Amino acid sequence: MELLFVSLLSLFLLILLPLSLLFLFPSSFSTTTTEANKNSANLPPGLTGWPVVGESFQFLAAGWRGNPEKFIFDRIAKYSSYVYKTNLMLERTAVFCGAPAHKFLFSNENKLVQSWWPSSVNKIFPSSNQTSSKEEAMKMRKMLPNFFKPEALQGYIGIMDTIAQRHFAADWDNKDYIVVFPLCKRYTFWLACKIFMSIEDPKDVDRFLARFNLVAEGLLSIPIDLPGTPFHHSIKAAEFIREHLVAIIKQRKIDLAEGKASPTQDIMSYMLLTPDEDGKFMKEYDIADKILGLLVGGHDTASSACAFIVKYLAELPQVYQGVYKEQMEIAKSKGPGELLNWDDIQKMKYSWNVACEVLRLAPPLQGAFRDVLKDFMYEGFYIPKGWKVYWSAHSTHKNPEYFPEPYKFDPSRFDGSGPAPYTFVPFGGGPRMCPGKEYARLEILVFMHNLVKRFRWEKLIPDEKIVVNPMPVPEKGLPIRLFSYDA
């Protein structure tokens, strides 16, 4: 029966789905006037794959099989080019690979290209349809620096350490076996709830987390809103979270008016009290939508990084010992009950090198799409307006030209000035570089500190498969056996 189901599903995907999508999204597949008039232009080499869906399934399947870079490097080799064309996510796409391509794209943000997400994202976050993605990004980036500037970040360290201690006490201590990935998600989500919304009660955090996972799973799914599909579950989960966020926002407005809440205590208060250039304040629904988006970016990537740190430290005892030695020197310098501070974070140089090597080998952000704003030429190839460009982190992270022996775990790559510019891009680059990069660094290092001073561990599934959908995740969640230093 299972084989029959798979066969029927394959038939649907390969035949019926393309035809359905053609009727649902006809504008996505029509030939533009610009392209028709310039059909003799030198487009990049490549194939667009199956009608309508193109090579989307090959692209996604490479990740499902745990080898997302195969799609990228196979085509680089096939076309002997670091730029090639394909069809991804129902869009004609030029894939840009290598450090020079990264530099070109990041340097031309909002000039030749701008941020773009598949239509599934806009349907899950409806307020993003009211303005352009460029305008949305500019609004958010004007708000976020106040919360990610150095003095603000320094104030988060003690909060992060407190929550990390509570997290390990509740979910790790006195356990013989745990499954790592869901616990890492709980840790980073707890932090995001506290710092973005001042929510720290574990029960309130867990109420959101289960549905929040459904939101993340649907972001890059096929945008068909039918019962049972990941996209449908994602929309419903987002509606549930948004409804509860609006209730929290309404109460916050009352608390601010009565002096029970501070105007600067978190991002929620700031959004409520900060008008735009026209003197207008954001609506409650829009604030809920923005906070939902921040929660996606504020915890999913770090949770993946934390889980893979656990994975690699289990596999590499000598690396674990280096991290343990560094963190115990810091721990021994602290008084009873004294929390981590900025000076402690600055001493975690080897630990951060290890984290960076994890981010190189298993980047949470595999790459990103850009919308082409106007025709341009790159490396002699014509890229038409309206196409999408996809840049890939793997095209540099696992390229021996930039990282010799690219599959070897070597934290020393990040000693001194580190990798060459535009080769290490786990947080993107240019104006679109993740504004929460330093925030992520803090939550990862605080996690590592509290982890290694408590435990050693070993993997229960030595060769556990890694799947990418859309971020890398151990297929079984990374079950481990814990050995407590207090035991």
From Swiss-Prot:
GO terms under biological process: sterol metabolic process
Residues binding heme, per UniProt: 434
Enzyme Commission number(s) of this protein: 1.14.14.-
Pfam families: p450
InterPro entries linked: Cyt_P450, Cyt_P450_CS, Cyt_P450_E_grp-I, Cyt_P450_sf
One GO cellular component, as annotated: membrane
Keyword tRNA-binding: no
GO MF annotations in UniProt: heme binding; iron ion binding; monooxygenase activity; oxidoreductase activity, acting on paired donors, with incorporation or reduction of molecular oxygen
Cystine pairs: none
Membrane topology note: Single-pass membrane protein
Residue ranges of the TM segments: 5-25
Keyword terms of this UniProt record: Heme, Iron, Membrane, Metal-binding, Monooxygenase, Oxidoreductase, Transmembrane, Transmembrane helix
Coiled coil ranges: none
Domain of life where this protein originates: Eukaryota
Keyword NADP in record: no
Cofactor names: heme
Cellular localization per UniProt: Membrane
UniProt cross-references to SUPFAM superfamilies, sorted A to Z: Cytochrome P450
Reaction catalyzed: beta-amyrin + reduced [NADPH--hemoprotein reductase] + O2 = erythrodiol + oxidized [NADPH--hemoprotein reductase] + H2O + H(+); erythrodiol + reduced [NADPH--hemoprotein reductase] + O2 = oleanolic aldehyde + oxidized [NADPH--hemoprotein reductase] + 2 H2O + H(+); oleanolic aldehyde + reduced [NADPH--hemoprotein reductase] + O2 = oleanolate + oxidized [NADPH--hemoprotein reductase] + H2O + 2 H(+)
Similarity remark: Belongs to the cytochrome P450 family.
Protein name: Cytochrome P450 716A75
Species per Swiss-Prot/TrEMBL record: Maesa lanceolata
